[in-house]
Amino acid sequence: MNKIFLYMFLFFLFWGNAIADTKDREINLDQLFEQLKKSSNTSVAFEIELKIWNIWSTHPTQNKLTQSLANASDLMSQGKLEKSYKIFSTIIDIAPDWSEGWNKRATVLYLMGRYNESLSDIDEVLKRESRHFGALSGQGLVHIELKNYEKAIKSYEAVKKIYPFLSSAKVMIPQLKKLIKDEAI
């Protein structure tokens, strides 16, 4: 009987903090997204954006995954796409609920020209974090590559609702509308 209490104690000692950290993380994200919507200017919005990216890019319980994500992101920025793709895939296998693993792999798939696979990964991101303005922006870019301009506009309009000051959304929507209008002529 004492062993049961010991195991329960150890479980709550180690996993209780992780559960609490996850709740705190969600509350913090909710507050940041509210601030982002209400931000008064671009520089304030950008500071909030950086805080959100920091939370997204940090795995809530596994520092090694956070480091792996950072390493694979560095590889991706160096053009080592296949290598970064494999690391992002491993991260997803280990932590399928972590939206940023999916988001980074969607990005590398986009860079590899594998647009439909990128869209599939973006869908996975949005299942886990519907406010992921990075994934929505990426979705817009993929739709542009696929010449699905109406869908791209919808993606950027969704971004604008979440992050009104994000310049890519503000710039892309009128450009895409003009492109659609010009193609209709």
Each model region followed by its residue ranges:
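Boundary/linker segments of alpha-helical solenoid repeat arrays
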Residues: 43-46, 60, 133-134, 163-175, ...
